[in-house]
Amino acid sequence: DRYKQLIGQMALLPIVNRGIPIVADDYVESDFGTGVVKITPAHDFNDFEIGKRHDLPIINILNFDGTLNKEVPKQYHGLNVDEARKLVLKELEDLGQLVKTEPYKVQIPRSERSNSILQPLITNQWFVNVEKLSEEAIRVVENNETQFIPKNWENTYFNWMNEIQDWCISRQLWWGHRIPAWFGPDKRIFVELNQKAAEKAAELHYGKKVVLKQDDDVLDTWFSSALWPFSTLGWPDETADLKKYYPTNVLVTGFDIIFFWVARMMMMGIHFMDGQIPFKEVYIHALVRDEKGQKMSKSKGNVMDP
């Protein structure tokens, strides 16, 4: 209620001199601080969702190398984020619009491997709609067709599955299973088992042979891992091993990958194996930690040499 008279009006963004709309959204806690936040839909996960709800423009200001692009004033072109921040402060001060500067703690996303600060960037990716897939995977655990040991880890499984979102399965890496998608000369996409099949489909569509370019992205490692219970046994062929060993009795794993691996194996197994669960029991073991209680990781350098 404090700012309802401002909703629907515009604020002027300094330096850029662009009008930005003032909107109301439940994401903001009205009784916390000023009850007002600035959002950047192209460079923050929560802001992106708010931007979609209010049909706000998605303005990306970053190049892939982390420098600023031509969506910003000319004096900022090519600067990295740290350089740009310093120049913003100087320009605001020169304009007489800088009220104060003070140290302020905020949550900043960092790479779990390099510890570098992450700068979110809007890009085109491949997604799997897993909402329907999750429904049956939830049901079989609720009905004890698959059981967690200890049983309390079912809560972690359900928490993830009940809040599941579309799964981004594409990665921009040098190593991995290449996404089986090919682009035609007009960017039409052909998804096939191999390039020969894609070329055949493209020839039927265009009425002639054309040059196709395969997508450079690779699959999320957890995608191929999700197929492990049956793909290692000869699937999609109906092999003797597949008939004998699928489903298996027990999966032994750590609690930290219940969602990343266990849940996805459940969804993929049930979907591709005619409703059959991949395993009957999931045995969750403890994690070996270092003397400070931290998970052992190559990136942290706290792994013991065996």
Q: Whereabouts are the PLM-identified features?
A:
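Conserved active-site neighborhood of enzyme catalytic/cofactor-binding cores
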Residues: 37-39, 43, 66, 143-149, ...
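A short, compositionally biased
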Residues: 2-9, 55-56, 104-106, 175-180, ...
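Conserved oxyanion/phosphate-binding beta-strand-loop segments in alpha/beta enzyme cores
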Residues: 1-27, 56, 116-139, 206-237
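Residue patterns forming the tRNA-binding/recognition surfaces of aminoacyl-tRNA synthetases
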Residues: 18, 27, 31-186, 211, ...
